[in-house]
Amino acid sequence: MESCRGEKIVKPELRKPLVLAAALIAGSLQGPGTTQAQQAPIPTNAAEVPGPAPGTAMTKAYVQMVGRMAYLWGWPLINVANRAAAFSKVPEPGLLGGVVPVAFNRIAMLTDYISPGEHFVTCPNQDVVYGFAYADLDREPLVFQVPDFGARFWVYALYDARTDEFSKIGKQYGTKPGFYLMVGPNWNGETPAGITAILRSFTSVVTMGARVFMDDTAEDHKAIQPLLSQIGFYPLSQFDGKMKITDWSKLPHFPAPVSKDKGETKWVNPETFFDQLPTVMQSVPPLPGEEALYKWIDSVLDAANKNPEIKKTLTETAIASEHELIDPFFQWRNNGRPAGNGWNSPVNNAAWGTDYLNRTGTAKSNMYDNKPEETKYIYTDDDAQNKQLNGKNLYSITFPKGQTPPVKGFWSLTLYNEFHLFNPNSLNRYSLGTKNKTLKYNSDGSLTLYAGAKSPGRDKEDNWLPAPNGTFSLYIRAYWADQAILDGTWKPPLVAQMQRAQP
């Protein structure tokens, strides 16, 4: 039947079945118990994103892959945890092995350059007087004192458990003398009167390093002592608003950890790495964006607790990763960026964030750098011909006139042996630079320094860094560097071989 407009007309007796059929079809499309399409919840934060499903089967290759990444990521954290544990055992501030300042929840200061027998950390320097300590801020916040250093360069570096520096305390920041409070991530107490500022760490475990410049004269060694005696870190409960004075020359001595290695004390054991990692991860919260990484690693650690074969694979992976991933970082060419003329330099030291490559590389080769605006580090193992430096040769390092490292603080060139430690020598000399008052400049105003096992000649010995008879490396420090160093405009000099190897 059609209407006058040509439309088809459905007879009344047929309408009801058609409507019923349409409803049934619509219902079948929507599904049981629903009336419209539903949107799955969209995660609004990392905690709402599902992680690996518990109990899922894991292949050996998968466990190796996760274990390898976890080893690279976690190596600096385990390193810090083991150093802090060693320091926590000392009853009071003192000297570890009679050499290294050691303290927990306080600080210990040296009164002179660090001894060449130091093996606690690689790449020490003899341009500053060191203070060092670890602390657990969950126990109690710490107060630290800043004396009036006058024109002298100084810097306090405060690091979290990842070796990221969370402080800006020093000469280059214009820090005022006074009392400062260092607190952990969960502290919500009241700030007592007399505190100049508060610094908050992202983690409860922190490392504290004080560096105060001293030149190599007897006069400056005497002049610095009253300043050193005013440096102090101590629990908030001991704060009374008065500057505490300490005679650091009377520190007790404690035995150093026993080590069979000739190099740095071994702070990471691959065979126990994955036994320690769960505890460390619980004490070091994930950075924003790291939540998925934590879940990924946790899932394999949980599986290893239930399956001996997975645990065995993780241990094997750690041992292999120590050799394949970590050991190569000890070569300077594998650290940072090329800085010119065969040298390398990091650009984000002590501000690593999620840069696991450079953080772990530095933790292996020269742990506890300062931030670039505090210190610029430039290093090499090779000469101008890309050949490994060797003390059997004599090398010259010439800075053209006006081209010594441009700094507002000071600069130095340090020589290290194959272990990135000092090479004991009869001159008791390990670095040359601003601190040295007897450097001899060339007639054209340039400065040539020498490195090698044998003297370059009596007339050049003031400019000579004695080297071992084997491999060694060179290391430039530029404290409070000018922009030309920070942006790479200034280039370090070539290391030129002057004579062939001795028979």
What is the role of each PLM region?
Residues 38-503:
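A compositional/structural signature for long, glycine/proline-rich flexible linkers
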Residues 26-34:
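C-terminal segment of classical bacterial N-terminal signal peptides
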Residues 15, 29, 59-62:
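Residues at the start of alpha-helices and the adjacent loop-to-helix junctions
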Residues 7-19:
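Bacterial N-terminal signal peptides that target proteins for export
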Residues 18-27:
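Hydrophobic alpha-helical targeting segments used for export or membrane insertion
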